[in-house]
Amino acid sequence: FEMGFIDDFTDVMNMETGALKYIMSLLQREYAGELDLLHAQVPEITEIPCIKFMDAKTDVIMKKFKYKPTDMKDFDPQEEEILGKWAKKELNSDFLFVTHYPSKKRPFYTMDDPADPEYTLSFDLLFRGLEITSGGQRIHDYDMQVAKMKEKGLDPAEFETYLMTFKYGAPPHGGLGIGLERLTMHLLGFKNVREAAMFPRDINRVNP
């Protein structure tokens, strides 16, 4: 979803936290029997803790778990698993927000952190060590967006319609994309995301 007139990207994180609280509460209230059949453990959510990307990379993954990353700008699946274990053990949470991802790894529309432009006002949400969401604050200033496109090697002329919005005024806004099938897969303990989709799609299956 996308939402306008935000104060900062934490508004988006708070909205997702509220949505997940509602979803998990509804599942426990309305579908307890079905969840028992599948031996699903529905997490209790009060608040979702968060940690900055570089703190997670250096303090948790490298120092605490002695894991040597191959990429300092992103996480590999094993690093996400490490963070999931750490969040459960140290913070008693199945969920963990990781914020301030490097600008080089985020799309052209992601707002850089004014305090440190090498990083962004963005986040991923991990659920039991699996990324289920990416989101953040979007750029809403025309000149800033054009500059970011050029920095990413894109031609602003090819995005004329997109940029018109910012020319005539756009509010501070943000949004996220959530993998509901990933969430369902991990919640129910499935091994493959196709098991959590009614009509799975891949390069060999496009119909129905």
Segments (PLM) and residue ranges:
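A residue-level signal for conserved active-site and pocket-lining positions in enzyme catalytic cores
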Residues: 1, 56-58, 98, 135, ...
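A generic structural motif
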Residues: 2-11, 129-132
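Hydrophobic face of alpha-helices
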Residues: 13-20, 142, 181
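Composition- and surface-driven signal marking solvent-exposed, interaction-prone regions
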Residues: 13-17, 110-111, 137-138, 197-199
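Residues immediately flanking
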Residues: 3, 100-101, 129, 180
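Metal-assisted phosphate- and nucleotidyl-transfer catalytic regions
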Residues: 18-128, 151-164, 168-169
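Active-site pocket scaffolds in enzymes
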Residues: 136-208
